[in-house]
């Protein structure tokens, strides 16, 4: 059955006290509305509609890659009013699923349960029973247990306020009925708004079957109105992701101290120490160990690689059996072949480091192509920038570079060459040559040491 999916994202979100649209605030490193759009996009045969209003330009710009139909609601008058704005774009057949841009943890599996029950004479509601239902619309059922209406908190009687089953706001309605119901909505209520929930009573009146589905947990349908609720959902999501990683064979030394701000994929027997941040798309191979206080962003780490504490890796590719850190920084464009080693206080950028090569301490290697089994001494620098342009340093296999060497790019060092410590290399070094470029040492006898006055 074809579906229209409407995501409501027009609210002002004044309690967030922010210059940004509420739905653009992030949970797990991803804007809430993008999480909802991503989940909605998994449903087949669907057309997305995004209702925007307050700061709608921000929302539209942030979500343009989803190719959703943008519908403006500049003067919001309730959820029913939002659907009425979308009504001209709805397909004649099929059904319309209503979601919310500030309910970011809704699961595709829950929506699939709803769509499985959908047909031209059935309305599907997502409901949940809460110990404290304050603030939610109550689900009213008749003696046979059939849903007959949803009553909002401000319009509910005392007996209705005692009902624990509440409306989550998410519903799936057949389009052949929905158009008429939307046209018949009125704003005769305490808020003076057009409630989408009023279509439930209309469906019951018209003999349409009303069935309910429940989410897996309360967090799945929790909305965000302020930063306290945002923080609570952040913790919930991080806990869910931590549990999933452990169930898939990763060890987290403290599951409460990991932050995943994107997508983290791990092989078996991965070990992650405390206070690590994973941002964007990160892949950790089998047997990878990540020490404490590391930050990995948009990178792939090969099997059995060890990443020691306080290391930053960004937009890099790391091979198998590598050894990185502590206190190392791999900047965008770094590629480490298998068994490469990057030690403490080493920074790389747009650097290809060959198999078995070692940059053990206190070095900067940028815009470099380095072969296999190269040893780079402490304090070595590639001088890649002339003030205007970046230049390439090329180091072939089996090169030994002494400590405190400066390689002034563009420069090439051929296979098997050796560079003496303290050299500044500005010219090509040939195969198996020894290069030294430093001032001659002079020793003066009986030199008088300066005396403090």
UniProtKB/Swiss-Prot annotation:
Pathway: Nucleotide-sugar biosynthesis; UDP-N-acetyl-alpha-D-glucosamine biosynthesis; N-acetyl-alpha-D-glucosamine 1-phosphate from alpha-D-glucosamine 6-phosphate (route II): step 2/2; Nucleotide-sugar biosynthesis; UDP-N-acetyl-alpha-D-glucosamine biosynthesis; UDP-N-acetyl-alpha-D-glucosamine from N-acetyl-alpha-D-glucosamine 1-phosphate: step 1/1; Bacterial outer membrane biogenesis; LPS lipid A biosynthesis. It comes from the Bacteria. Acetyl-CoA binds at residues 378, 384-385, 403, 421, 438. HAMAP family: GlmU (MF_01631). Residues 249-453 are annotated as: N-acetyltransferase. The active site is at residue 361. Residues 228-248 are annotated as: Linker. NCBIfam families: glmU. In the N-terminal section; belongs to the N-acetylglucosamine-1-phosphate uridyltransferase family. In the C-terminal section; belongs to the transferase hexapeptide repeat family. Binds 1 Mg(2+) ion per subunit. Keywords: Acyltransferase, Cell shape, Cell wall biogenesis/degradation, Cytoplasm, Magnesium, Metal-binding, Multifunctional enzyme, Nucleotidyltransferase, Peptidoglycan synthesis, Repeat, Transferase. This is Bifunctional protein GlmU. Mg(2+) binds at residues 102, 225. PROSITE patterns: HEXAPEP_TRANSFERASES (PS00101). The gene is glmU. Its EC number is 2.7.7.23, 2.3.1.157. UDP-N-acetyl-alpha-D-glucosamine binds at residues 8-11, 22, 73, 78-79, 100-102, 137, 152, 167, 225, 331, 349, 364, 375. Its cofactor is Mg(2+). GO terms for molecular function: glucosamine-1-phosphate N-acetyltransferase activity; magnesium ion binding; UDP-N-acetylglucosamine diphosphorylase activity. It is found in: Cytoplasm.
């Amino acid at each position: 059955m074809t579906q229209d999916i409407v995501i409501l994202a027009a609210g002002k979100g004044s309690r967030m006290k922010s210059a940004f649209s509420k739905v653009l605030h992030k949970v797990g490193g991803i804007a809430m509305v993008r999480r909802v759009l991503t989940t909605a996009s998994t449903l087949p045969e669907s057309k997305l509609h995004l209702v925007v209003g307050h700061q709608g330009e921000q929302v539209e710009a942030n979500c343009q890659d989803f190719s959703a139909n943008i519908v403006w609601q500049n003067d919001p008058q309730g959820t029913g009013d939002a659907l009425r704005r979308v009504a001209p774009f709805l397909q004649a057949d099929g059904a319309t699923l209503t979601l919310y841009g500030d309910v970011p943890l809704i699961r595709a599996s829950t929506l699939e349960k709803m769509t499985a029950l959908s047909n031209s004479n059935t309305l599907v509601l997502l409901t949940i029973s809460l110990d404290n239902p304050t603030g939610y619309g109550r689900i009213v059922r008749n003696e046979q247990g059939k849903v007959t209406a949803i009553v909002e908190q401000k319009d509910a009687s005392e007996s209705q306020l005692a009902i624990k089953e509440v409306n989550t706001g998410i519903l799936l309605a057949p389009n052949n009925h929905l158009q008429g119901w939307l046209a018949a909505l009125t704003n005769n209520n305490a808020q003076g708004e057009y409630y989408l929930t009023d279509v439930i009573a209309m469906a019951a009146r018209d003999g349409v079957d009303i069935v309910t589905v429940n989410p897996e947990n309360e967090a799945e349908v929790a909305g965000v109105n302020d930063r306290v609720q945002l923080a609570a959902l952040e913790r919930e999501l991080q806990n869910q992701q931590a549990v999933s990683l452990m169930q898939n064979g990763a060890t987290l030394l403290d599951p409460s101290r990991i932050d995943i701000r994107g997508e983290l994929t791990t092989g078996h027997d991965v070990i992650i120490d405390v206070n690590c941040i994973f941002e964007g798309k990160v892949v950790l191979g089998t047997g990878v160990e990540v020490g404490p206080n590391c930050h990995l962003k948009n990178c792939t780490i090969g099997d059995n690689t060890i990443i020691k504490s306080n290391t930053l890796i960004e937009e890099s590719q790391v091979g198998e059996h590598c050894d990185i850190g502590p206190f190392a920084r791999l900047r965008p464009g770094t590629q480490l072949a298998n068994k490469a080693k990057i030690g403490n206080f080493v920074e790389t950028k747009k650097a290809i480091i060959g198999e078995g090569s070692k940059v053990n301490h206190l070095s900067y290697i940028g815009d470099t192509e380095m072969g296999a089994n190269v040893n780079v001494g402490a304090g070595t620098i590639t001088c890649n920038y002339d003030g205007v342009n970046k230049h390439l340093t090329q180091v072939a296999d089996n090169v030994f570079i002494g400590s405190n060497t400066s390689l002034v790019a563009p420069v090439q060092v051929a296979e098997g060459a050796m560079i003496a410590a303290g050299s500044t290399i500005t010219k090509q070094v040939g195969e198996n040559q020894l290069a030294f470029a430093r001032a001659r040492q002079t020793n003066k006898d009986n030199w008088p040491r300066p005396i403090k006055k």
